[in-house]
Amino acid sequence: MRRTLNKTRFLAGKTDPENTSLWLPLWMHLWDTAGIMERLVRQWLPESVKRAMGFDREEALLAHARFLGGIHDIGKATVAFQANILRTLPEARQWLETLTPLDCPEQNRRESPHARAGEAVLLWDDCPGGIASIVGAHHGKPQSCAAVDDQLEGWESNYYPKGQKEVWEDFWTELLMTVLQDCGFDDTAELDDLNPQEEVLLTGLLIMADWIASNTEYFPLIPVEELGSMEDYPARVDRAWEKLALPFPWEAQPGIADPQEFAVRFGFAPNAVQRAVLEAVDTAAEPGILILEAQMGVGKTEAALAAAEVMASRFGLGGVFFGLPTQATANGIFPRLLGWADTQSEETLPQAIKLAHGMAELNECYLRLQGRGVQLEEDAQEAHQVQVHQWFRGNKQALLANFVIGTVDQLLLAALAQKHVMLRHLGLAGKVVIIDECHAYDTYMNCYLDRALEWLGWYKVPVILLSATLPARRRAELVEAYQQKKAVPDAPWKTSCGYPLLTWTDGAEVKQTAIPPDAPGKTVQLTTLTEPELPALLRRKLAEGGCAGVIVNTVKKAQKIAQLLRESLPDKEVQLFHAQFLMPDRAARENQLMARIGKGSAPECRNDLIVVGTQVMEQSLDIDLDVLVTELCPMDLLLQRIGRLHRHRRSRPAPLQQACCAVLDTGENAFDAGSEAVYGQWLLWRTRKFLPRSIRLPEEISPLVQQVYGWEREAPGGAQGEEMRCVYEQTQEKKKARAEAYLVPQPETHRLAQLNTLDDWMQNEGARSDPAARAAVRDGDPSVEVLVMQRRADGSIHFLPWQEGGSAVAADSPPPPETALKIARQKLRLPAVFGKAWKVDRVIRELEADNRSRLAAWQLSPLLHGELILLLDENLTARLAGMELCYDRENGLTYQKEETDEGD
């Protein structure tokens, strides 16, 4: 910047509370931030984001970005801020007091935080409202119009002492004009008017630059007796940038649309579905939304990754976000996507990868990538071209890495009115967004997904949605959200039952094609049975060997069925798989099941094995069952479960050569209580009504789903059905209302959009922690997660007997980091009853009290701080909130009401 600063050299920008001999003049922090903004634009920002920011040429964007960095803390040039920050720096205070007294009523300072003050000062100097609002929002939340409007008049004593107005206005003018001239402007009138969408992205970039420039590891403070020197620039910024070493944007290479290149990348030639996807994205004139509806196991993941390469290469995207329904599915696909990401990264220009969910730091594969895994050995280290960059490890920075694999929550949070949401928009705007299992979200989550799609459509972010079982109505909602409701009403693509089906947009046009399958289909026979009939069916089906899967809707039902089968079929091996196992136990079971009934499993491993599980079997396991029993569930999920039946080609025992699925049901006039609690009556009733005797796959997948979900096109179905429908629809409306209370505004309907400002943009933001925010995008009661350890009769604390050899851990001191990581992995989500509104406070209160009395020192461990420890006795039982809990290796966690507790 031009060396014209005079009076403002004495203003303080940053101090060190622990070392009063250091400070940073305000001008230096502004120069640091401006320099980082420039480098982010030149070297880190993908081309697609530059276009979305609305400037016709990069130099204009660069000038505005540098201006924002150089002026963002002008609100610190106020008496309220300077009087406060200089309390502990008498020498620097003395310099400033030679120019002006620092008298400021302490009780009023909160009314003018420096971000708000900065916006007010810029508006005073006729800066465009949108630019000023970015400064007001740079701490993560835009200001309210009311708060900004009365700042200089209502709280003038926060801006300058009585009689000192001209002195402080001179400060503002000097800073503003210096920054303007450095950026090539002569006056604020030359700054562009932006719309709120462009301002969201620039705010995200400014927050990022400010965080980097505020890190003393990159930008050290200087001795308090120094004022800094212009001669240090740009070398000071260059050193920091080199030390930070952010990865460059991903530059996808063209050519993957060629079948030979595809085969090199993935190890097999593209099938009909994959070829259709690649043709669509290779010929589209503009980025858009693409929805692929295709059967389980057809290679949708590879199709999506190849399409992402094509679109990134054509439209200048700098990364990929891959979102999945659960942590288990994200963990399951992470090694696969890591392998793909390695092919996209060069050793000299490594890309950053991020596993983004609440328990990512417990994922062994992810830890090994960081060199932190507890099982890491020199000869076992794999060479990867991607890296886990330190700067992206924070939750709010997660989406800024090049390749992000995580739960769909990371995308949904971009639609939540939450502080610093602009960082999520910045990260997503530069990526191809892939959402797997897009049918798997309820009405509440879909509200957030739709709002996120509206913003992604505005930014022209390519979006790929994958599903095997998508209702046509939902397909239409997704496309219309991306196009901001601009689609043609009642267009044929909205009701198509073709399958596999590809729907995509090219500008305003919606295109669609049914893909002729290039592999033979299969017929699955369906029967129904009741619970008492189950053992006989499995005895008959497994008479000559083979394996069976039983998928039910609740953990309690799974445990009950497993016990029934163990007693009725003692010659068969019955394994349980559900969500209420400890993390290590569940991982061990998953690995065992993948080895025994996965794609490459041998007959001798499969024979006489019955796996009983819950929805996690349909979501996270690539298993191949010889026969399937599933509890009645909504048709789309039932078809997902059938996708685990005869999944791969293999030789099967004679009674199992015909694919057969038995549907476990209670009868015509009732539903299982647990199933009803999970899914409600209406969709269960509709599925039962349209359940066929056989299904031809894949052709009949879509027609069956549309039958169950297309009730609007039917005549009323009688009093019982109408009552269930009304209850269902009322429930969905309530879910929508709850979600809409916390959504960010739509891109084009923000009530101040015509004023081109972010003010009032996020007034429904609540003070939510990261876990609370993640919970806000999922409906229902909060879940309670615990770490499970054992307390023996002598009071010593141990791992469970089969975990870490049952070794002891000191209770009176923080565990060493490696031990703390092992403890943190003993995670278990308690059953839903423990999170109910009438129960959860008591649960947490009892656990916290027990932890304070026995394990207070563990809270000093960074990995264990804030965790709740459930201590089991020597019989692996515990009492909690009026419940008796028991854990064992075979069944997981079971619970029942305490017999002596009459009041709960």
Model-predicted segments: where are they?
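Accessory nucleic-acid engagement/destabilization modules that flank
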Residues: 2-254
